Amino acid sequence: MSLTGTHHAFASIDERGVNRALQAFFGARPHYLHYGSVPFVTSDSTTETLVQTIAFPGVPGGIAYAIDLTIPTTDLYPPDGALPPPLVLGPDQLSLTTEATITIGCTAGQSADGKRGQVMPVSTSLDVIAIGHPVSVYFSPGVGYVRFQLDQVLVENVAPPSLQAVLDCLLEMILSAVLSSVELPFNIIDVDFFKLILEAGPTIADNQIEIWGDVS
Amino acid sequence: MTALDSRVIGIGSCFAHRFSSPGTLQYSLSPLPSALTTGADRASSYSVTVSADRNDRPPRQYVTVRQANGRLVASPARLEITAGDIVVWSADRTVPFGFRVRGTIGSNVLDSAALVTESIYTHAFGLAGSFEWADANGSDLRGQVTVAMPDAAEGHERWLARIGEGALVHVRGVSAEPADLQIVVGQTVVWAVEDAPGVTITDASLIGIGGSAASAGR
Amino acid sequence: MPSDVVAAVDQTAASTLLGAAEAALGTLTKTGSGSLGPLGASYSASASFSGGTVALSPPDTIAIDNLQIDYSLGLTLSVDLSFLDFCIPQICIWTPFGDICTPKICFDFPTISVTVPFASSATLSADFGLKVHLTSGDWYVDVVIESVPALDLGAAAVLLLAAIGSAISAALLAVPFIGPLLSIAVAVITAAFGLADVTGLLGPIVSAFVAGLTFTVYKQPQNFQVLPALPPYNPAVMVSLAAVSADVQATDKNELVLSVDI
């Protein structure tokens, strides 16, 4: 069976290629993985993104916090191994795993070591697994990209279930927001071999993202 | 190949004059038609001495003008002739553009750029076409020479014979006879000027009068 | 191990890519010299390529049929006219002032340069091979002609021969005193060379454009930009194209396949 099938052009990027592309993307633009309010982050830069503190009555300046993610690793269908229930990786889906570190600035009075009046960081790291699927955005021949839309997120090893539900939702919102900035342009999928007129895909099969079309 | 212009005598053209009376012509040569003035005559380098005695001299004598060390040189520089003889000036291949002869004999001016009487201008036509000619000095003198390609059927030998035949135009005053002349490429036309007010034989296109229609230049 | 990125085109799309490569090649130019019979000849020539139908053949052959080469030629011939040297004899003619005889005038005919502009086209069919190389930091996939085919230049040679004859006649017309000798000159000059000589001159000129003919169907820097910089906080995203290969694969369709590791 030909690669192009009923079309004239075909391009694919495999799992290793996607992961290398993500490493390149987040390596160049790490601010998409590191978010924090003062005092954790003082200004926007290439390495971190400044966010507002969480306003709360009686907490001067609001609740300081930071979210740090590791570079996500993808697994394209078919899965390399079993996923924790209830996650199931189906055709045209990919899984993403990352470690999310959540830090809050604990003001003295709430801290464990009894110090008053100081902001002490308190962190926890969570393993996060998400299931998603690729979506294409096509503008013109050779101009367009593939991005990822999350279908389900699971934070492993959290109890009680109600806390897990809260964290699942929180991390799903955060990961969706992060992934909304991640684009795999056509030119990395076809390494600019041609200007693709997208006709089919992206699909995920055989551990690769595949697209079909014609050339201009 | 020089243009049809008696103001500049080049390869394929000649200036000639019949010296009817004894005397000595002192003359100069110039590469430009306008360069010689009466003042320059005083520095004339060349002469033609006309005597009444024949002394076995031939009735036609020749002066060859050449270019040497950037100057025009007449050879022979001094010529002795008998009254009634014709002197013919012509250029050799060293002369890049042409020359003008101007001088005085007694009270008369002899000027190849202002033909008066007993003066002759010859020109060999190298290209086919229709050549209207006129006087660059402003008189009403004019005419036309039509140069045709020879008939190929006549053959090369016939053409060589034809170019050995000259064609005469007799200029009296400001009239030319014949005014229209037909020749073939390679033939020479001879203008014999008599009783004229100092005229030139010049391609009309050079002086902005009408035009010549040469099939490929002149 | 499979490559990270695979891009493939079938014969239809390969023709499109080849057309773009032909256009990108632009106009090639060459200068040189040769001879046309006894005449010296120098030339400046240019050529461009277009069209052709593509047939992909595994493992690495691209056959192109009816590729059109449009060429133009500025030919300069050196013609020695000294064989025409002659003299106008002394002429003697009566004038009212007496007989006048002019001196004999001899003419040496020069060597003239005759410029012949000419343009035509030819078609060729040939096999091309794939050549992948990394040169000066760029990856190339070139389609390189494997052997120079015989070019049919017969009709063009006939036209060029006529053009040369016309140009020589026109150039001779401007030579003073050539007039009655023109037909002799043209006959002698054009008899000095024939169609075989013209073909012998034209063939190597056009073939020189075909020898080593190379179309680049892929060229990208090894340090490959995925996303451009987006100031102020988003530098360009780059990956390295570590390895590139290309071949023709046959299944139910023959396809040109580019495989890249990043």
Model-derived features: positions:
Chain A
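Tubular lipid-binding modules of the TULIP superfamily
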Residues: 1-113, 142-216
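Extended lipid/amphipathic-ligand handling interfaces
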Residues: 85, 128-139
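Amphipathic hydrophobic-ligand
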Residues: 114-131
